[in-house]
Amino acid sequence: MSEFDNAIPTAFDPFAEANAEDSGAGTKDYVHVRVQQRNGRKSLTTVQGLKKDYSYNKILKDLKKEFCCNGTVVQDPELGQVIQLQGDQRKNVSSFLVQAGIVKKENIKIHGF
């Protein structure tokens, strides 16, 4: 029986490496810009993944003034601080973050529709 025990492979988890918290040189910190459909034609844009060094409230204030929309900063238990803006502001937010020098263009991921 011991010969067969050695021949049987152990359980392999293909997602173990993806779930591991590694801070290697290959990992990038992406900023995710998403749009969520609310009721009717209303939508909500969320910005997640900004560095903690930045003041979220100051960025929100500039975004609201630039795009003439309302917004708030929400504390999420899993995602941390998330900026929410009214309306579909995906392209506006991504161009604003690049022009302000907050994020590089290749580090922005736009999700939605």
Curated annotation (Swiss-Prot):
Pfam families: SUI1
Domain of life the protein comes from: Eukaryota
The protein's role, per its UniProt record: Probably involved in translation.
Signal peptide positions on this chain: none
Sequence similarity: Belongs to the SUI1 family.
GO biological process assignments: regulation of translation
Species of origin: Salix bakko (Japanese willow)
Descriptive protein name: Protein translation factor SUI1 homolog
InterPro entries from the UniProt entry: SUI1, SUI1_dom_sf, SUI1_euk
Alphabetical UniProt keywords: Protein biosynthesis, Translation regulation
